[in-house]
Amino acid sequence: KLLTDNDIPTLNEINNIMETIQQNNDEKAFLILSLAVKCALTNTEICSLNKEYIVINSNDEMYINYPPKGNNRISRIIKVPDDVAVLLDRYICNNNIIEGAIFINKRKTRIKLRDTERLLEKYCKLNIEKGMLNNKFTMQTLRHAAICYMLSGGASKDLVASYAGITTKWITRYDKIINSDTYKQAVDYSIISINA
């Protein structure tokens, strides 16, 4: 299915949601949504994130190294943007996470997919009530937005597909959006960058 402009939140809408989260001092929600928007992580990847998957290279750059799973047996390595790396490091320190799940729920167990969707829904509703948002978005639409902004920012389809952990055949579903006037004008090259 080709995606349209209406399927993807704009930078202003994402910004409004993030500002509302900051105003509510919700460090966990801010980090979760940052991982979706700036790293194009899936909801499943966010919920399954373990401390052991986080690595720092010799240049002090943070990466997430998801172990191989499924039939392809290929690990996925994601470069974490510096601003998100600071948030993630602070969250780990503030919550004294030594090992295991990065995100836990109120029951002190690993956060579930529905928990993250509820977090996002809560802040979408607050923005709808303030007239700052027209539609609710899902974790998947935030990931779609991340991919669209990378493509709009000039990253190659192959590089974006590799970073997002998908095949290039799936990238064509974003063509209509990145070629629309809305995204040509709205793209903010600083929101997401990919270094080859």
Language-model segment annotations:
Residues 1-16, 107:
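Flexible interdomain linker/hinge and immediately adjacent N-terminus
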Residues 11-41:
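Basic, Lys/Arg- and aromatic-enriched nucleic-acid-binding interface segment
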Residues 14, 28-30, 113, 117, ...:
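Short, leucine-enriched amphipathic alpha-helices that occur as contiguous helical runs
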Residues 35-48, 153-155, 164:
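A short, glycine-centered helix-capping/turn motif at helix boundaries
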Residues 48-84:
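Conserved tyrosine-mediated DNA breakage-rejoining catalytic core shared by Y-recombinases
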Residues 70-89, 100-122:
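C-terminal catalytic core of Y-nucleophile DNA break-rejoin enzymes
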Residues 173-196:
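DNA/chromatin major-groove-contacting recognition/catalytic segments
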